[in-house]
Amino acid sequence: MELRCTADRETRLLSILRRELQLSSTLVRRLKYCSAYTVNGEPAHTDRPVRPGDVVRVCLDEPRPDYPAEDGPLSILYEDEAMLAVDKPQGMLVHPSFSRQTGTLANRLLGYYDRTGQACAVHPVSRLDRDTFGVVLLAKNAHAHALLIAAEKHKTYHAAVRGVPQPPEGMIDAPIARLSPESLLRCVRADGQPARSAYRTLRTEHGVSLLELQPLTGRTHQLRVHCAWLGCPILGDPQYGGAESGGPGQQLCAVS
């Protein structure tokens, strides 16, 4: 992918990159080592003077990831030249990890890019736990990723929980920490990191409630921990008290 801009005043290339093309300072530094900048077709450094009428181009091509592309179902809810919104199924990682390089959403997305002739990267703007399903936003290049991260507002989830929250609507303000230094699990603890989640009960039936949840901070397992702390664990959550024998899995869905 390429960004292009025609200068309308005397300035330096760095000013065009930051103000006109809105590249982050981190991306500007990264791209300058890739010979990504040209002015009137000639390679240029960020301190080069730029005059009115000069054409600035930025190549955003990135090295192909070292994990494999895979074919498989991919539910694309929205796509344009900069981003996609994908409906991630339950039980799938968003991105490969050290111990798992296949079977993730990113593997399937690479396969989709190959089939559609797109030389794009995989930059998750939002990440969901393996057992959380719903909407994942992914940028196609580092520039779009930075812009989407900066513009991202509150995320909204729906969750089926055991019990009826009291009050039915409110704010959970409870710090979250590791259960122990070596544990991957979290808990509410006074010495934890600040964590806030808004909740609203949408419906209650037979001792099960449907909640709308908005995490206002971004702690690991935040919604799962907060719901359990509220006394209403998410159904199907085996780690925080909501496991159901033979049930449909963790009932937490990202909706927007």
Which residues does each predicted region cover?
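RNA pseudouridine synthases
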Residues: 1-256
